[in-house]
Amino acid sequence: MPQYNKLQVEAIFGGTVIDHIPAQVGLKLLSLFKWLHTKERITMGLNLPSNQQKKKDLIKLENVLLNEDQANQLSIYAPLATVNQIKNYIVIKKQKLKLPKIINGILSCPNENCISKVELKAADFIVKIKLNKIYLKCKYCERDFDHKIVTKI
């Protein structure tokens, strides 16, 4: 594979870079994690060339630092992503993601009869793996859902 020696997306002075997001997932992450509501600059690369994945998405959040729990919640949709903290254009911390045990306050339960729908609030989910697939169990209605059908609030 050829080496790519030119930045496809402009570097940031400080903040967070989320790299190795599967292609076509970057916009979903922006929406799910409500980063579109920040007043800080967001730079994205979609369908960028990648040696590991053929194509990838990339998100750069200027002046935004994710804590470990926030970063690990990304692994539901981007398990191979890395989260890099940047300071003065230099990576000061690189985090490989781990699947969290619980996801709080981000996603909405797909069950129309769930009490979280009546209260118009985000549900809390317990993360489970069955047959190498990720499922989310709603803490309110106790139903399991494939992670791909659980949506933002």
Curated annotation (Swiss-Prot):
It comes from Wigglesworthia glossinidia brevipalpis. One of its GO terms (biological process) is pyrimidine nucleotide biosynthetic process. Keywords: Metal-binding, Pyrimidine biosynthesis, Zinc. One of its GO terms (cellular component) is aspartate carbamoyltransferase complex. Its cofactor is Zn(2+). This is Aspartate carbamoyltransferase regulatory chain. NCBIfam families: ATCase_reg (TIGR00240). SUPFAM superfamilies: Aspartate carbamoyltransferase, Regulatory-chain, C-terminal domain, Aspartate carbamoyltransferase, Regulatory-chain, N-terminal domain. It holds the Pfam family PyrI. InterPro entries: Asp_carbamoyltransf_reg_N (IPR020545), Asp_carbamoylTrfase_reg (IPR002801), Asp_carbamoyltrfase_reg_C (IPR020542), Asp_carbatrfase_reg_C_sf (IPR036792), Asp_carbatrfase_reg_N_sf (IPR036793). The keyword Oxidoreductase does not apply. Belongs to the PyrI family. Transmembrane segments: none annotated. Contains catalytic and regulatory chains. Binds 1 zinc ion per subunit. Involved in allosteric regulation of aspartate carbamoyltransferase. GO terms for molecular function: metal ion binding. Zn(2+) binds at C109, C114, C138, C141.
